[in-house]
């Protein structure tokens, strides 16, 4: 079992912890998250970005992690970035908690996400269905109030 964690921080009061676990390269990865400080009762874009660089805030994280050169999509779509995790839903206090199981996100192997970044966006991800070029790249999910680098843990 390989385990990783990303501690999300940013300048907008959004923060949280994301843990990832994968038993083997063939198995799906379980992603557990608890993120506070978002708007209440909202959906926010949630992605893994290419770089583990947060030196200039979350902008330094680069684009969505996309080793297979696909367009942006929903987590269940065949055509999607590896980093496309869809939206997280917040409760009345602005806290999002949940578990995602994803077969494209890997901690083991050549497309591992270890060392990359998890980013929470300020807007809702349109899942590539927005009908414009930006939708096919980012889902029009907007600014990046919080991010964290994915690192191995025990």
Swiss-Prot record:
The gene is SOD1. Gene3D superfamilies: Superoxide dismutase, copper/zinc binding domain. Homodimer. Keywords: Antioxidant, Copper, Cytoplasm, Disulfide bond, Metal-binding, Oxidoreductase, Zinc. GO terms for cellular component: cytosol; extracellular region; mitochondrial intermembrane space; nucleus; superoxide dismutase complex. It is found in: Cytoplasm. It comes from Candida glabrata (strain ATCC 2001 / BCRC 20586 / JCM 3761 / NBRC 0622 / NRRL Y-65 / CBS 138) (Yeast). Signal peptide: none annotated. This is Superoxide dismutase [Cu-Zn]. Disulfide bonds join 58-147. Cu cation binds at residues 47, 49, 64, 121. It holds the Pfam family Sod_Cu. Its main location: cytoplasm. Residues 125-136 have a biased composition (Basic and acidic residues). Belongs to the Cu-Zn superoxide dismutase family.
